Amino acid sequence: MGKSDVSISRKEFLELSGIALLGSTLGLQTLTSCESATVIQGQIVGANHAIGHLLRKAISLPIHQSHQTKILIVGSGISGLTAGYFLQKAGIKDYEILELESHIGGNSTFGEDEARYPWAAHYLPIPSPENKELIDFLAENKIITGFDENKLPVYDEYALCFHPDERLFVKGFWQEGLIPNMDILDGEKNQIGEFLSKMNAFKTAKGNDQKWAFTIPLAYSSSDTSFTDLDKISMKTWMERNAFTAKPLHWYVNYCLLDDYGTSIAETSAWAGIHYFASRKGKAANAKDDDVLTWSEGNGFLMKLVAKNQLNHIKTQRLAYQIEEKNGKVSVDVYDWKTEKRENYTVEQVIWAVPQMLRPYLMPQQKSDFIKDFTYSPWMVANIQTKPFDTGRGQALSWDNVIYEGNGLGYVLSNHQELSQDQQTWQLTYYKPLVDNNPADERKKAIVKTHEEWKSEVLTDLKKAHPKIEESILKIDIKLWGHAMIRPTIGFIHGSARYEAQKSLNNKIHFAHSDLSGVSIFEEAFYHGAEVAKKVISNIYHGDTDYTNFHGE
Amino acid sequence: MDKNSAKIPILLLFSVFLVATCGLIYELIAGTLASYLMGDSISQFSIIIGLYLFSMGIGSFCSKYFDENLLDWFIQIELLVGLVGGITSSVLFVIFNSVDSFQWILYGLISLTGIFVGLEIPLLMQILNKSNFGFKDIISKVFTFDYVGALLASILFPLVFVPKMGLIRTSFFFGILNTLVALLVLYNYSAQLKYRLTLWFQAIFVFVLLTLGFIFSDNILSWAEATTYDEKIIFAKSSPYQRIVLTRQGSNIKLFLNRNLQFSSFDEYRYHEALVHPLMTFTKKPEKVLILGGGDGMAVRELLKYESVKAITLIDLDADMTNLFRRNEMLTKLNQNALNSPKVKILNQDAFLWIKQNKTLFDAIIIDFPDPNNFALGKLYSNTFYRELTHTLAPEGLIVVQSTSPFMAPKSYWCVNKTLQSVGFKTLPYHVFVPSFGDWGYVLATKNEFSKTQNFPEKLRFMNDAAFEQSKVFPKDMAQQETEVNKLNNQILVQYFEEEWAKVM
């Protein structure tokens, strides 16, 4: 996202968002992606164009309804839902969650028709033992079914990714695993080996503060500059400096970073790049350290668990468009685009659980120059329903199927965790971060493409490995994510913007989102949701205001 | 020389060329087919070439008995070569599995083609000789065209015809070429021919026959491939899940699922008695029994030999399979109409999903799934699946699992044993010899002790105390070995199974 993206005024934003919903290229797709997240089923399903137009009217509308609530959470992605989850655990019930779209979940959104399939995030690596809150959450929800005599978690075997998990299509043949190992030179093979052992060394490395050099949550990582200085160069530069020049290795690292961050090897900082390989320290009684948890609906499964006890606190189809402090409280203007009515919330505490890039629009009175450092990568996700097809030579159809030097990131077989012998339709989820140009340009390009164009782009890529796949395809749905992931570019993670952005405003408006970590993964969203809940809970119980009435109901 | 006789050499020399090409192609097709169908390509090619050349010699020898009506004879021979050569490969493909003496038919057809081809050239030379050409010229021209044709054939055959047309179509194609030569000569010299009407009739018949063969050669091929079963197919159906094929030879009926032999009526009693009865001798008052797989009803037939058994639930995904074994008279005779017993409840459901939601407890569970040759089936042999079974098994109940061959795939077999143990079962591995399968293994499992509660039924044909005692002994070449536990997230059993069967297939 360029500087121009954030320099428009709130009034312009409101005016332009109508156009944005009609397919503007202003990079506001996350906000406007409510119904405009272009779901295509053989055609481009039209966005809810009316919202934008009516939004302009909203400002002139009289306030239809005024609400008083103690806490308001804006956004029902993982961070917002997690905040609510921990509020509930602390016995706090006087809160509401507002969601712009008509469904909840953010990047954990999933689709459900004949099959269930993810629209974005689709797995969780088994977490490190240090990630106590997440481990507790998983245990509470029976994804961890118990602990063995060494206190290692025992995971639900239906959630651990079934074998075969990964395969890579190289020169007409599917090899097992994603690290290229077929048809490569000895020298290249050696480099890959050295690279991986170097990453393993980083995995166990600690800084002078005795903290892990790289860990998840990212906030627990060491601030030792011998590691954090790696944030000042790109992963590509770091690899070149360390004589890691082999082409297959560069392909592999680039692939991994695109997959997790939506940024290329040249854009990702070396710290973030190494973090990908070195931060996961999962341990389990019944799984390998690098095993992952996955479900047909991807992280939608986890999202439902976080949300399940608070569904009556969530209001969808609500656009919060103005947040300001008034008389010691916070006033939040909300547009209900379903009923086309304007609402106002007067609340004690606000949990901001949407991307930072929206701050200048919703809180124009606040100084937020640092927001320009928050940039987001656009993605295209295709969900493809097929009849069984010839899966090619070599390793059998796997969970993750990647084409070497392919155009996208390959596809995940979303029905991989199904137990049935009888799988007459398959669901492939195909991922592609849009990284040919800068994110703003890519968003412009993406929004004008037709379903036919996306379809042929996806098919061209898949046909490299499955020449006859088209005959077996029943349906291709496409969804565009304007601002899918925060980009851990050079200097971002250990720069000042991320720290500035995390500061609460007057102890009344608090921030929680994975973009505050610089890494768009479930664990970080969960961490920020949990952290912000702690702050709010402490304010509620120990603040000077009278909250005696708080337990309500 | 008149006007016509000047044309003779050109047309006939062209015939020599085509005849030589076709002749060599038939030889190559025969060699390829023989090594393809019977293996051992060195012997097959060697025998075919020798036999073919020898037959040509016989043909040449016989040519001296032809004195009159040489052109008639030439056309006649040409048509015969076209017919026999053209249909040889499809005949061989089709009969391959249905006759015992395949190679004699192969050699017979080769000899016949060789004899006809051997006649062609000498006959042509005689014809040319009578047209007052110099002997030297005839020899030189005929053999030149003969050898050029041979070279062309041997180059085009592997590079163009086999890859582009396949053996059957190539065969028809050259048969048609032979017939066209005959037709051309027939047309041009009709006036000189004595039997022209008969020859015309024959030529057109052969031409139409070969052309039809050429057009429908794909159908012939697929039909021929369907006969790669050893015996006569008496039933074939593709259900949504598998290809069901029944064959019969004499009184022996075999069932194939996706080309894998499931049973042979000749010795299936061994397999099914061994599957069912040891389990029952250890089960205290078996009333409710669950069978997973086993849609053929043979295991049910064995179970119905126990009066204590009151209810049998059979879970088999494929309704086509269970319906077949409930309705087909020949098959209900085999399973003694077991699937129509009022004690039996058939559920055409997915075993894993059914087990996960099932709340009923069973006294005995019989698991008769196909071998774990793919990842979908591998799930049904996982520790997770066996753990689910413990929720469906009465506290004192027993399970038996068909566990592939401990001789062919010892690691796979012992992996099933280990996986059962890993979820808290005590196991009792045993194996029996089933001639159609080989040495076959089973594993009994229980959370209790194995204590015998009843005797084997008396009327069994195979299983008794002595046979069971013997079946518990594993000789050195199939002795227990260390393996990993088969889990959903490693599917190690499928890997073992593939490695071990790859060695012997």
Where are these regions (language model features)?
Chain A
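Active-site/ligand-binding neighborhood in enzyme catalytic cores
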Residues: N200, T204-Q322, W337
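N-terminal Rossmann-like FAD-binding beta1-loop-alpha1 element of flavoenzymes
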Residues: T69-E96
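Extreme N-terminal leader/targeting segments of oxidoreductases
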Residues: G2-K70, K89
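Conserved flavin/dinucleotide-binding core of flavoenzymes
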Residues: A37-S60, K171, G177-I179, D183, ...
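Glycine-rich FAD pyrophosphate-binding loop
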Residues: Q88-G111
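Mid-domain catalytic core of redox enzymes
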Residues: T316-Q427, A465
